[in-house]
């Protein structure tokens, strides 16, 4: 009977070891599942960052074009009263000129406005 008791103890120890291995395997599977979810989130965020970075070249180009539009005005154009002495060279009649207010001639020139321009890549990003 001594041999049987030793085999029984050996089998119980083996069973306990297998239960620990099973528990550790389940825990590792759970952690790997959570890690795969986090990796997929990181992947989506990386794609978003890549899309934003792809737009920076066009944004920089549009800002540059807008700032170049300001270069056509001299410093004197922004001084108060600089537009008062200039004559209206349009071919409008005097009746049409009477509808224009005096304030219209005294305003400073405004910079060109930025407008949205559709980019050909928009169709690709929607897919």
Swiss-Prot record:
GO molecular function: microtubule plus-end binding
UniProt keyword terms in alphabetical order: Cell cycle, Cell division, Centromere, Chromosome, Chromosome partition, Coiled coil, Cytoplasm, Cytoskeleton, Kinetochore, Microtubule, Mitosis, Nucleus
Coiled coil regions in record: 1-51
Chief localization: nucleus
Pfam family, one: DASH_Dad2
Keyword Metal-binding annotated: no
Compartment(s) of residence: Nucleus; Cytoplasm, Cytoskeleton, Spindle; Chromosome, Centromere, Kinetochore
Biological-process GO terms, alphabetical: attachment of spindle microtubules to kinetochore; cell division; mitotic sister chromatid biorientation; positive regulation of attachment of spindle microtubules to kinetochore; positive regulation of microtubule polymerization; protein transport along microtubule to mitotic spindle pole body
Source organism superkingdom: Eukaryota
Basic and acidic residues biased stretches: 84-109
Record-linked InterPro entries: DASH_Dad2 (IPR013963)
Annotated stretches, region: Disordered: 82-127
Recorded family membership: Belongs to the DASH complex DAD2 family.
Role played: Component of the DASH complex that connects microtubules with kinetochores and couples microtubule depolymerisation to chromosome movement; it is involved in retrieving kinetochores to the spindle poles before their re-orientation on the spindle in early mitosis and allows microtubule depolymerization to pull chromosomes apart and resist detachment during anaphase.
Subunit structure: Component of the DASH complex consisting of ASK1, DAD1, DAD2, DAD3, DAD4, DAM1, DUO1, HSK3, SPC19 and SPC34, with a stoichiometry of one copy of each subunit per complex. Multiple DASH complexes oligomerize to form a ring that encircles spindle microtubules and organizes the rod-like NDC80 complexes of the outer kinetochore. DASH complex oligomerization strengthens microtubule attachments. On cytoplasmic microtubules, DASH complexes appear to form patches instead of rings.
Protein name: DASH complex subunit DAD2
The organism of origin for this protein: Candida glabrata (strain ATCC 2001 / BCRC 20586 / JCM 3761 / NBRC 0622 / NRRL Y-65 / CBS 138) (Yeast)
Gene: DAD2
């Amino acid at each position: 009977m001594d041999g049987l008791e030793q085999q029984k103890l050996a089998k119980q120890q083996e069973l306990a070891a297998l239960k620990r291995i099973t528990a550790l395997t389940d825990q590792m599977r759970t952690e790997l599942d959570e890690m795969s979810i986090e990796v997929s989130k990181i992947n989506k965020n990386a794609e978003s960052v890549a899309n934003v970075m792809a737009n920076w070249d066009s944004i920089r180009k549009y800002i540059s074009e807008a700032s170049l539009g300001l270069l056509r005005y001299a410093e004197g154009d922004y001084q108060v009263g600089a537009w008062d002495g200039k004559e209206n060279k349009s071919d409008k009649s005097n009746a049409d000129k009477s509808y224009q207010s005096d304030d219209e001639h005294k305003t400073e020139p405004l910079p060109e406005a930025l407008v949205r321009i559709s980019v050909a890549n928009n169709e690709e990003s929607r897919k």
